A protein has these predicted regions:
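Register position in tetratricopeptide repeats
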Residues: 50, 91, 125-126
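Canonical positions in the second alpha-helix
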Residues: 71, 104-105
Protein backbone atom coordinates (compact mmCIF):
# COMPACT_ATOMS: atom_id res chain seq x y z
CA UNK A 1 0.00 0.00 0.00
CA UNK A 2 2.77 2.44 0.92
CA UNK A 3 4.64 1.53 -2.28
CA UNK A 4 1.55 2.32 -4.37
CA UNK A 5 1.12 5.65 -2.55
CA UNK A 6 4.71 6.72 -3.18
CA UNK A 7 4.59 5.47 -6.74
CA UNK A 8 1.40 7.46 -7.37
CA UNK A 9 2.92 10.52 -5.69
CA UNK A 10 6.08 10.20 -7.78
CA UNK A 11 4.12 9.84 -11.03
CA UNK A 12 1.87 12.79 -10.15
CA UNK A 13 4.84 15.01 -9.30
CA UNK A 14 6.63 13.95 -12.48
CA UNK A 15 3.62 14.84 -14.58
CA UNK A 16 3.17 18.20 -12.87
CA UNK A 17 6.85 19.07 -13.19
CA UNK A 18 6.92 17.89 -16.80
CA UNK A 19 3.96 20.04 -17.75
CA UNK A 20 5.57 23.13 -16.26
CA UNK A 21 8.88 22.56 -17.97
CA UNK A 22 7.18 21.95 -21.30
CA UNK A 23 5.53 25.33 -21.11
CA UNK A 24 8.57 27.26 -19.96
CA UNK A 25 10.39 29.53 -22.34
CA UNK A 26 13.61 27.83 -23.33
CA UNK A 27 14.84 30.76 -25.38
CA UNK A 28 14.78 28.75 -28.59
CA UNK A 29 12.76 31.39 -30.41
CA UNK A 30 13.96 33.05 -33.58
CA UNK A 31 17.58 34.10 -33.29
CA UNK A 32 18.57 37.69 -33.91
CA UNK A 33 20.15 38.27 -37.27
CA UNK A 34 23.50 40.01 -37.65
CA UNK A 35 21.56 43.02 -38.92
CA UNK A 36 19.33 43.08 -35.81
CA UNK A 37 22.35 42.77 -33.51
CA UNK A 38 24.09 45.58 -35.40
CA UNK A 39 21.08 47.89 -35.04
CA UNK A 40 21.15 47.25 -31.28
CA UNK A 41 24.83 48.20 -31.19
CA UNK A 42 24.15 51.36 -33.21
CA UNK A 43 21.36 52.40 -30.85
CA UNK A 44 23.61 51.74 -27.87
CA UNK A 45 26.43 53.73 -29.48
CA UNK A 46 24.13 56.69 -30.08
CA UNK A 47 23.22 56.72 -26.37
CA UNK A 48 26.89 56.65 -25.34
CA UNK A 49 27.63 59.40 -27.84
CA UNK A 50 24.85 61.55 -26.37
CA UNK A 51 26.33 61.09 -22.90
CA UNK A 52 29.77 62.09 -24.17
CA UNK A 53 31.26 58.63 -23.76
CA UNK A 54 32.86 58.59 -27.19
CA UNK A 55 35.20 55.65 -26.58
CA UNK A 56 32.33 53.29 -25.72
CA UNK A 57 30.33 54.67 -28.63
CA UNK A 58 33.23 53.98 -31.00
CA UNK A 59 33.51 50.37 -29.80
CA UNK A 60 29.78 49.84 -30.37
CA UNK A 61 30.01 51.34 -33.86
CA UNK A 62 32.94 49.03 -34.64
CA UNK A 63 30.98 45.97 -33.47
CA UNK A 64 27.95 47.08 -35.44
CA UNK A 65 30.03 47.63 -38.56
CA UNK A 66 31.50 44.11 -38.43
CA UNK A 67 28.03 42.61 -38.12
CA UNK A 68 26.70 44.80 -40.93
CA UNK A 69 29.52 43.76 -43.25
CA UNK A 70 28.68 40.13 -42.49
CA UNK A 71 24.99 40.81 -43.03
CA UNK A 72 25.72 42.53 -46.35
CA UNK A 73 27.80 39.55 -47.47
CA UNK A 74 24.99 37.11 -46.61
CA UNK A 75 22.15 39.27 -47.96
CA UNK A 76 23.68 41.85 -50.30
CA UNK A 77 22.17 45.12 -51.43
CA UNK A 78 19.59 45.67 -48.71
CA UNK A 79 19.04 49.44 -48.40
CA UNK A 80 18.65 49.36 -44.61
CA UNK A 81 21.91 47.45 -44.21
CA UNK A 82 23.70 49.85 -46.56
CA UNK A 83 22.23 52.78 -44.63
CA UNK A 84 23.67 51.52 -41.35
CA UNK A 85 26.95 50.59 -43.04
CA UNK A 86 27.22 54.16 -44.29
CA UNK A 87 26.26 55.49 -40.87
CA UNK A 88 28.74 53.40 -38.85
CA UNK A 89 31.52 53.98 -41.38
CA UNK A 90 30.89 57.73 -41.26
CA UNK A 91 30.80 57.70 -37.46
CA UNK A 92 34.15 55.92 -37.46
CA UNK A 93 35.61 58.70 -39.62
CA UNK A 94 35.74 57.14 -43.09
CA UNK A 95 33.54 59.61 -44.95
CA UNK A 96 34.53 58.40 -48.42
CA UNK A 97 33.52 54.78 -47.80
CA UNK A 98 30.44 55.88 -45.86
CA UNK A 99 29.34 57.91 -48.87
CA UNK A 100 29.83 54.89 -51.15
CA UNK A 101 27.54 52.79 -48.96
CA UNK A 102 24.90 55.53 -48.93
CA UNK A 103 25.06 55.96 -52.71
CA UNK A 104 24.86 52.20 -53.22
CA UNK A 105 21.72 52.15 -51.06
CA UNK A 106 20.20 55.09 -52.93
CA UNK A 107 20.77 53.31 -56.24
CA UNK A 108 18.45 50.59 -54.93
CA UNK A 109 15.96 52.84 -53.11
CA UNK A 110 16.27 56.53 -54.10
CA UNK A 111 13.58 57.55 -51.60
CA UNK A 112 15.11 55.86 -48.54
CA UNK A 113 14.56 58.47 -45.84
CA UNK A 114 17.41 57.35 -43.56
CA UNK A 115 20.00 57.25 -46.32
CA UNK A 116 18.97 60.65 -47.68
CA UNK A 117 19.11 62.19 -44.20
CA UNK A 118 22.46 60.69 -43.22
CA UNK A 119 24.01 61.41 -46.62
CA UNK A 120 22.95 65.02 -46.18
CA UNK A 121 24.69 65.08 -42.79
CA UNK A 122 27.82 63.63 -44.41
CA UNK A 123 27.76 66.35 -47.06
CA UNK A 124 27.45 69.05 -44.37
CA UNK A 125 30.35 67.60 -42.34
CA UNK A 126 32.50 67.39 -45.48
CA UNK A 127 31.58 70.98 -46.36
CA UNK A 128 29.63 70.13 -49.51
CA UNK A 129 26.51 72.08 -48.58
CA UNK A 130 25.36 72.32 -52.19
CA UNK A 131 24.99 68.52 -52.31
CA UNK A 132 23.26 68.44 -48.92
CA UNK A 133 20.49 70.68 -50.26
CA UNK A 134 19.67 68.19 -53.03
Amino acid sequence: MIKKFFLSLFITLSLITGSYSASSDTGNGPKKTDYDKAVSFVNSAKKFEKKGNLEKAKKRYEKAQKLLIKSNENKPNKPNTLNYLGFTTRKLGDFELGEKYYLQGLAIDPNHVGINEYLGELYVVTKRHNLAIE
